[in-house]
Amino acid sequence: MFFLKFAAGISAVITVSFFAKTKCKKMRSEYEFFNALNEYLKSVKSAAGYKKAKISEISVENADFKEFLGNFPVTGKLSDLTAPEYLTEAEKLKIATLFSFIVSADAKSLNEALNSYISEFGGITDEKRANLLKRKPVYLKVGFAVGLMLFIMVI
């Protein structure tokens, strides 16, 4: 009987740790997307002479971009950022690739995060980057602690 309880406890620790690790991966992919998009938009801003542009002004009118975005709700005008006089075909593909980061993620939470973290070019501050990365290990620690508690309760 002891071994059965021990096995149940170990499986609880593994399960909780797995879900915590999955959450960390999602946060990391969001951070990478925000960082890549921010850097790209900075280059567009300097090339196009934009003073200010908001993510909420981006939309998808081109079918190629719709394919990358899937059902992700984006508003505004992407055509402003992909105007031929500003960007090459490679740069257009680059912004489409950046948007492809979000296709498999939860659209609602990422949409809210985009609106809150990137309201204009350079919108990701060092503090926000640090917060995203600081929270990451907490999920593993909490997940392991909860799993360990379940393990102790089972035994």
Identify the function of each model-found stretch:
Residues F101-A145:
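Membrane-interface, cytosolic juxtamembrane amphipathic helix immediately N-terminal to a transmembrane helix
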Residues A7-V16, R129-I155:
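Bilayer-spanning, highly hydrophobic alpha-helical transmembrane segments
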Residues L37-Y40, V44, E91-L98, I102, ...:
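Amphipathic alpha-helices that form helix-helix packing interfaces
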Residues F2-V74:
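Juxtamembrane/interface alpha-helical elements of multi-pass membrane proteins
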Residues G76-K108:
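Short, non-transmembrane cytosolic segments of multipass membrane proteins
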Residues F72-T82, A130-R135:
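Juxtamembrane/interface motifs at transmembrane-helix termini
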